Amino acid sequence: MSNNMNIDQTDQNTIDEGLYSRQLYVLGHEAMKQMSQSNVLIIGCKGLGVEIAKNVCLAGVKSVTLYDPQPTRIEDLSSQYFLTEDDIGVPRAKVTVSKLAELNQYVPVSVVDELSTEYLKNFKCVVVTETSLTKQLEINDFTHKNHIAYIAADSRGLFGSIFCDFGENFICTDTDGNEPLTGMIASITDDGVVTMLEETRHGLENGDFVKFTEVKGMPGLNDGTPRKVEVKGPYTFSIGSVKDLGSAGYNGVFTQVKVPTKISFKSLRESLKDPEYVYPDFGKMMRPPQYHIAFQALSAFADAHEGSLPRPRNDIDAAEFFEFCKKIASTLQFDVELDEKLIKEISYQARGDLVAMSAFLGGAVAQEVLKATTSKFYPLKQYFYFDSLESLPSSVTISEETCKPRGCRYDGQIAVFGSEFQEKIASLSTFLVGAGAIGCEMLKNWAMMGVATGESGHISVTDMDSIEKSNLNRQFLFRPRDVGKLKSECASTAVSIMNPSLTGKITSYQERVGPESEGIFGDEFFEKLSLVTNALDNVEARMYVDRRCVFFEKPLLESGTLGTKGNTQVVVPHLTESYGSSQDPPEKSFPICTLKNFPNRIEHTIAWARDLFEGLFKQPIDNVNMYLSSPNFLETSLKTSSNPREVLENIRDYLVTEKPLSFEECIMWARLQFDKFFNNNIQQLLFNFPKDSVTSTGQPFWSGPKRAPTPLSFDIHNREHFDFIVAAASLYAFNYGLKSETDPAIYERVLAGYNPPPFAPKSGIKIQVNENEEAPETAANKDKQELKSIADSLPPPSSLVGFRLTPAEFEKDDDSNHHIDFITAASNLRAMNYDITPADRFKTKFVAGKIVPAMCTSTAVVSGLVCLELVKLVDGKKKIEEYKNGFFNLAIGLFTFSDPIASPKMKVNGKEIDKIWDRYNLPDCTLQELIDYFQKEEGLEVTMLSSGVSLLYANFQPPKKLAERLPLKISELVEQITKKKLEPFRKHLVLEICCDDANGEDVEVPFICIKL
């Protein structure tokens, strides 16, 4: 037995937030600490085993130990990306260990040469792949008895299985991973009936538990005790009698409490006889029992043939395998009518080893490992069987001859798809947009599949970003030495090492995909592509790529993740709708008046603090620099700015009245800001609306969501107060290029004896109470004489030649720049003003930075599903039901698959037209010829024609203008109207057209594509 490195090392006390930040927002600190104390054993280092190990290492367990003494074979390279042809004959675990160890410096990886059941006691979780059922039973008998989590997984061609046994008394602390529900309450009766504020839905279910904070009239209810919920309606629920706490409560906040749940698992031996299934596809509800028998039969077949599985497409082996299945079904006394065709397909594919299946199953299994080690999220209970038979090609001959081994690295894939289909995969020309988490996984999968390795194949990948430390947790092609380098270049290099046949076959770009890069990703570029794959993190770019794919009639593979959730979509020309056909609802935003004057949630104060950061350290600096560098800046601002007064005052303050000459002056400036925002403005608000104010209807003004604030008096010994001064002074110094200090003694010395001027409330100050009122700034901007007076007081730019300020460009992941420090301090001070529970730096960073929670497990699952759809596109499948859009939530073991939505059709003069994919293809004719074509050939009268924002033709235009335009070619007309020459790379023009039919009725028609 080789050295088991650091299995018993001391627990990690601290978590590297810089590395794990995106994952921490999914799991939380407590779960991460538990994980970092858990040793994991992984048996089997083929494609599925290494995928599980890779994800578990990235996630950050205490240690990973590998067991696989089997020698590397050429066919292993179909899915095992850490093996090379030079490793053939060397034990798989021995080759893999050093590659896995590179993934995460905090996770030692070691190899064990021999396994004994007693040795298993070292581990919190044991994962078994590529292992006979007899051996699995031996291991599980021991793990079940000794409270060690056990997971078994197998990938056989387009079929896969997962089995979980976490013991009879597994405690799950959070069953769904959702943020606890929270809401504002209006009232609580002594019977415990809680009514929500302003008829907002509480979202709770019977049996949920909640706790209360900030409840008035019943202070005893704020003790943090979880209380069981009985739902009365969408806006009311009961917590049982609270008579002993008072007669009535009002205001306050409820927060859902996650209560631990006990889950009991059966052992493998019991589960073989009495299985419990998770159903991933409701269209295949009858298949899990078939697969339950078949996967046992595969092990029995291998036992009878010295470990060999049925040969690809071999009918003799398939017939024998079917007999094994019948025998097992009879022994277990299962009332299942075996589907002979389906069962034999499993035999045909048993030696298949597909990286797409390994990625999908490996991501799902790794998440189960994390559940076992953290007790967070609901486990798969207990059998999960999956197939993607729709991916089996029909465009090529699949036979024993075409699927037999070739002695090449793709033999595991050829065993399923055949050698002819392998050539199709090698000939692909693909475009990957994004080389982040999903992009890395996609490139790895393509390298194993042999995508674009043929003579005519090519991969283009673009990503404008550089690698950051936080990327390393899930973008597994990158290493710490790559931080600062370009993602597209590093990813391309990494996969070319995995599969040397890709050397020279990948072109990496650093351009953002958008209108500005159409000179690079133009007509010629898109016309050569077989398909496009999105690996993007924003909707705008996705929509743009989608439009380009529709225009060039290219298939698009779309996917995304959010924490443990993920989705995939396949877009097929002339068959499915496009990505842009349906859109997510817009992101919720907070009313301005709520943020400015009436916050009631910590999210409100964080958003306010984020705006304050921009308003103090970014926007005014930009205005100053524009004033100093642009001669017409003032004139333009007075005409176009929504708040010209603020722009002018910013320039005056930052150049004259508040310009610091030393860091000490920056400290004093920060102190003034404290009084302004957390004392004076609050006093002014209370002057306008005293705490006993009533509305026009006689109701208390400060009630419901409006909380009466309390001014803060500065105390240098209060940590939040001091943190604000340090962050604000440091950022202000950064703007002016002054050296900042962190020594508290300096701040105490500067601020000693400072007495702020007493606050004097101002009359006539208007405060916006609701969204319907005019913002007070609007009125202030109407005094043109005062605006001119401020403008005249500014120093001329000529007196400050060469002087510039440095704006603070918000960067959430640099802990040394004071950005999150400032926002956290400002948000929490405002929370103190309004009696809102403050948030720590971690939560503040999440909200202010709009961080998208991410897990390497979800990314792996998504990439696997996308590649299963890619195979269908290569095959050219024509039936919409053969494609699948997928959605999953690994936290609750939910997988759903649906047929894509068909592209909508319409009829124009009796002719059926596809609303998305059809277009009128015309040469660069004259405007008159175009109008005549539609009149004669389509029976339509053109009423309007445009290109982008340029109106080319309208039937109501003056006759003189029409006479000038009708003889011009479309390209000439566009150039004349836009006053710009068409770019040389452009081969097409897109025109939007409005038409009437013979009855004068407006008709919806597709766009026109003019070929130049």
Swiss-Prot record:
Q: Does the keyword Phosphoprotein apply?
A: yes
Activity control summary:
Ubiquitin transfer between the E1 ubiquitin-activating enzyme ptr3 and E2 ubiquitin-conjugating enzyme ubc4 is enhanced by the presence of magnesium and ATP, or adenylated ubiquitin.
**GO molecular function list:** ATP binding; ATP hydrolysis activity; magnesium ion binding; ubiquitin activating enzyme activity
Q: Which SMART domains does UniProt cross-reference here?
A: UBA_e1_C
Covalent cross-link (Glycyl lysine isopeptide (Lys-Gly) (interchain with G-Cter in ubiquitin)), residues: 588
Catalyses which reaction?
ATP + ubiquitin + [E1 ubiquitin-activating enzyme]-L-cysteine = AMP + diphosphate + S-ubiquitinyl-[E1 ubiquitin-activating enzyme]-L-cysteine
What InterPro entries does this protein map onto? E1_4HB, E1_FCCH, E1_FCCH_sf, ThiF/MoeB/HesA, ThiF_NAD_FAD-bd, Ub-activating_enz_E1_C, Ub-E1_IAD_1, UBA_E1_C_sf
Please describe, based on the UniProt annotation, the reported consequence of changing residue 701 to A. Answer: Nearly abolishes enzyme activity. Abolishes enzyme activity
Its BP terms in the Gene Ontology are: DNA damage response; protein ubiquitination; ubiquitin-dependent protein catabolic process
Where does the record place it? Cytoplasm; Nucleus
Catalytic residues at 593 (glycyl thioester intermediate)
**Residues the record lists as binding ATP:** 22, 437, 463, 471, 474, 487, 513, 537-538
Q: In which pathway does it act?
A: Protein modification; protein ubiquitination
Is ATP-binding found in the keyword set?
yes
* Gene3D superfamilies the record matches: NAD(P)-binding Rossmann-like Domain, Ubiquitin-activating enzyme E1, FCCH domain, Ubiquitin-activating enzyme E1, inactive adenylation domain, subdomain 1, Ubiquitin-activating enzyme E1, inactive adenylation domain, subdomain 2, Ubiquitin-activating enzyme E1, SCCH domain, Ubiquitin-activating enzyme E1, UFD domain
Which ranges does the record mark as transmembrane?
none
Residues at which Mg(2+) 1 binds: 465, 468
State which Enzyme Commission number(s) the record gives: 6.2.1.45
Its EC top class is ligase
Residues recorded as binding Mg(2+) 2, renumbered to this chain, are 537
What family does the Swiss-Prot or TrEMBL record give for this protein?
Belongs to the ubiquitin-activating E1 family.
Describe, as the record does, how this protein assembles with itself and its partners: Monomer. Interacts with the E2 ubiquitin-conjugating enzyme ubc4.
Report the NCBIfam families cross-referenced here: Ube1
User: Misc remark for this entry?
Assistant: There are two active sites within the E1 molecule, allowing it to accommodate two ubiquitin moieties at a time, with a new ubiquitin forming an adenylate intermediate as the previous one is transferred to the thiol site.
Name used for this protein in its record: Ubiquitin-activating enzyme E1 1
Source organism per entry reads Schizosaccharomyces pombe (strain 972 / ATCC 24843)
Source lineage? Eukaryota, Fungi, Dikarya, Ascomycota, Taphrinomycotina
- As recorded in Swiss-Prot or TrEMBL, the protein's gene is named ptr3
